[in-house]
Amino acid sequence: MATPHINAQPGDFAETVLMPGDPLRAKYIAETFLEDVKQVCDVRNMFGFTGTYKGKKVSVMGHGMGIPSCCIYVHELIAEYGVKNVIRVGSCGAVRDDVNLMDVVIGMGASTDSKVNRIRFNNHDFAAIADFSLLEEAVKQARAQEVPVKVGNVFSADLFYTPEADIFEKMEKLGILGVDMEAAGIYGVAADLGAKALTILTVSDHIIRGEKLSSEERQKSFNDMMKVALETAINI
């Protein structure tokens, strides 16, 4: 039965869904990496697809930008479509000095300036963390493929254009690897609904050093990350 935001039918989604922010990126993943692909939803042009990777069923769907958007889609996938594993695949801006362009960052935990997890937890702090079994498998796959990987805390920001110019130096001091806009929300929804979640990010720019990938480097880095994510998806 369709939800307000996903017009797929029961059974259309695999137990594991890879989720980029951009729905066109979801389309690219499906067409590039999966076989026997079927588009299963398109409400608001938030495309979802299901296919196979090395013979195993995998789905991919966009989640939009920011915590409010991704929380809607992740909630409905888990609560209404029986999805058990959500793996966010996206990009981040690095802040720690030892994190470099094209590294893969795996969010073991996700700090945030959003209040969504406090709302869930009676205004208390909630430690938004990845599922360890997904985390362990992703690190294993990255090392097997010789993809440079950093594992640790990320920061999920509500504002892309932040007025807090000094916040990134504070993040670096506290050991935060990089900044995205969704991980903390996804981890909160998954915990609330009893599912597993992981965030895998490619470093597209370094916020403090002012470095950025070229379009060609960005694509290669994304493809490397996707191979890690897909191998994780079929081995959990």
From Swiss-Prot:
It catalyses: a purine D-ribonucleoside + phosphate = a purine nucleobase + alpha-D-ribose 1-phosphate; a purine 2'-deoxy-D-ribonucleoside + phosphate = a purine nucleobase + 2-deoxy-alpha-D-ribose 1-phosphate. CDD domains: PNP_EcPNPI-like (cd09006). It comes from the Bacteria. Keywords: Glycosyltransferase, Transferase. One of its GO terms (cellular component) is cytosol. Phosphate binds at residues 21, 25, 44, 88-91. A purine D-ribonucleoside binds at residues 5, 180-182, 204-205. One of its GO terms (biological process) is purine nucleoside catabolic process. The active site is at residue 205. Its EC number is 2.4.2.1. PANTHER family: FI09636P-RELATED, URIDINE PHOSPHORYLASE. This is Purine nucleoside phosphorylase DeoD-type 2. The lineage of its organism: Bacteria, Pseudomonadati, Pseudomonadota, Gammaproteobacteria, Vibrionales.
